[in-house]
């Protein structure tokens, strides 16, 4: 790029040169620099929170239906720039272009939902137990929202925070992933041209340690009222602890070890299709990616055979083409996946490709379509025979690898599904409604799919997890409004005298001894 990207605080660019320089590269051609970014420090994050605080009062006072019109304008701009934004996503994070188009559409869908919520930020009129007295409730914005997002969904997930936060009357400080800075810049430009006042949306390009230090200082100074974080369970726990010290409850959307239960009467062709998409789509780098397929022992061998066949037939390679998945997003994720591959032991049976590890001329994959030497491409891996005490069973892998474990009874399958302690997404393939509802009732996941994959979200359905996958907060739909507003109650006594609740209530005496 011809210019260095810098943070935007209060509508103004932070001068470049002061911060460390970070180069974001194309993971399919790692020598191709997509963006050069001047990284901000902790003080910059604090300044961004100050700018948001200064802008928030005026933004709060813009009537909600008008804020909804700004959201509508964002949605129209996203649709007008859909192809261009998707191309940036494909180039910078290696997401196949068809998937990138779907991700951009998710922003537009989110805007389409929330533009109407500007006219529906309803409170309630509540009857009082006193005469000549009325009770009301109101939704008020929380204030300043700091959103910290990962780069595997570099534009869709930020919209889940930023669109409803703005709609509710909050000002936002957004810290995107530095390895997805070009995506963040394009996203910000679309939002800025929708008419947002200066300071209402601020963007801070920073690394993790500086972000944490800045957030800590901003919380101490009372500049942040809500933190949203999408990322790893380990970092989410640290952010949760930090916010807890300031009596705040963050919105945490963390990792997943998402199970798929395949019963003895399941449609195996459909189950394999779901496993292929959720296990290897986006190179397994989704929080909702399939972790372990828990398959009834009577169909396990056939399931593994079919999944192996489908995975070997799938095209992996250049994300600009028609591929199942492209490269891993960044070197840091490739290094992490190399560690995961070390968890495969001699008692495991490995399927899915002509090799394991990084695809290269010396470790080729049949049907690969791309320049293997240029990018961060990895073989898909199916590991049969994983056990509950395996590292591969217990931990999120964030790469193109799927474990398979057998079960005998549904009780055993549910116990295995819950064992890793995550609780984001779970799936069951069955034709038995009783099994569906028994599974739904006892699975720990915040999202359950029936005869569908573990991956997939819609803008009007709550998204979020429990346990190691989050603290119970939900994104999307009307449910996210509770993250970005606080309820305020008001009582208005127009009787002209003091009426004391529970003490001055009119008593009506029933004859409870009456019998027919």
What spans do the regions from the language model cover?
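Residues at or immediately preceding the N-termini of alpha-helices
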Residues: 27-28, 42-45, 64, 82, ...
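Glycine-rich loop-to-alpha-helix module at the N-terminal edge of alpha/beta enzyme cores
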Residues: 30-122, 132
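Residue-level signal for inorganic ion chemistry
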Residues: 31, 67, 89, 111, ...
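Conserved C-terminal structural/oligomerization subdomain of aldehyde/semialdehyde dehydrogenase
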Residues: 32-35, 224, 261, 312-315, ...
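Short, well-ordered beta-strand elements within core beta-sheets of diverse protein domains
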Residues: 34-40, 54-61, 147, 260-263, ...
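ALDH superfamily catalytic-core signature
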Residues: 234-387, 450, 496-500, 506-515
């Amino acid at each position: 790029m011809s210019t260095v990207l810098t943070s935007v605080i209060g509508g103004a660019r932070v001068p470049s040169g002061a911060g460390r320089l970070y180069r974001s590269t194309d993971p399919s051609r790692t020598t191709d620099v997509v963006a050069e970014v001047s990284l901000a420090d902790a003080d910059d994050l604090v300044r961004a929170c100050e700018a948001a605080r200064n802008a928030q009062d005026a933004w709060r006072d813009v009537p909600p239906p008008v804020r909804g019109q700004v959201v509508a304008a964002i949605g129209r701009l996203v649709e007008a720039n859909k192809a261009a934004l998707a191309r940036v996503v494909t180039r910078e994070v290696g997401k196949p272009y068809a998937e990138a188009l779907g991700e951009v559409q998710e922003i537009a869908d989110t805007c389409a939902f929330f533009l109407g919520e500007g006219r529906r930020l309803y409170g309630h009129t509540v009857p009082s137990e006193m005469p000549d007295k009325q009770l009301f409730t109101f939704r008020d914005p929380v204030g300043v929202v700091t959103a910290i997002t990962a780069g595997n969904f570099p534009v869709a997930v930020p919209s889940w925070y930023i669109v409803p936060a703005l709609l509710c009357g909050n000002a936002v400080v957004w810290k995107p992933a530095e390895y997805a800075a070009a995506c963040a810049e394009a996203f910000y430009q679309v939002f800025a041209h929708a008419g947002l006042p200066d300071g209402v949306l601020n963007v801070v390009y920073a690394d993790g340690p500086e972000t944490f230090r800045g957030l800590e200082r901003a919380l101490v100074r009372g500049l942040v009222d809500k933190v949203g974080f999408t990322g790893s369970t380990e970092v989410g726990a640290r952010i949760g602890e930090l916010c807890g010290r300031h009596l705040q409850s963050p919105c945490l959307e963390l990792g997943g070890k998402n199970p798929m239960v395949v019963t003895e009467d399941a449609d195996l062709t459909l189950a394999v299709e779901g496993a292929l998409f959720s296990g290897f789509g986006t190179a397994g780098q989704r929080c909702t990616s399939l972790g372990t397929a828990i398959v009834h022992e009577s169909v396990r061998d056939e399931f593994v055979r079919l999944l192996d066949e489908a995975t070997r037939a799938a095209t992996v390679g250049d994300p600009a083409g028609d591929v199942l998945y492209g490269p891993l997003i960044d070197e840091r994720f490739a290094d992490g996946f190399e560690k995961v591959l070390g968890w495969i032991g001699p008692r495991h049976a490995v399927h899915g490709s002509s090799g394991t590890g990084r695809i290269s001329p010396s470790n080729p994959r049949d049907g690969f379509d791309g320049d293997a030497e240029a990018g961060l491409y990895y073989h898909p891996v199916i590991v049969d025979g994983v056990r509950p005490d395996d590292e591969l069973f217990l931990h999120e892998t964030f790469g193109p690898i799927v474990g398979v474990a057998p079960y005998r009874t549904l009780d055993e399958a549910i116990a295995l599904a819950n064992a890793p302690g995550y609780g984001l997404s779970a799936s069951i393939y069955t034709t038995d409604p009783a099994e569906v509802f028994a599974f739904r009732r006892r699975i720990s996941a915040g999202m359950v799919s029936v005869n569908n994959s573990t991956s997939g979200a819609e803008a009007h359905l709550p998204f979020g997890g429990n346990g190691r996958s989050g603290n119970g907060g939900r994104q999307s739909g009307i449910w996210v409004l509770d993250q970005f507003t606080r309820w305020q109650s008001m009582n208005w006594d127009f009787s002209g005298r003091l009426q004391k609740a529970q003490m001055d209530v009119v008593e009506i005496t029933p004859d409870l001894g009456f019998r027919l």
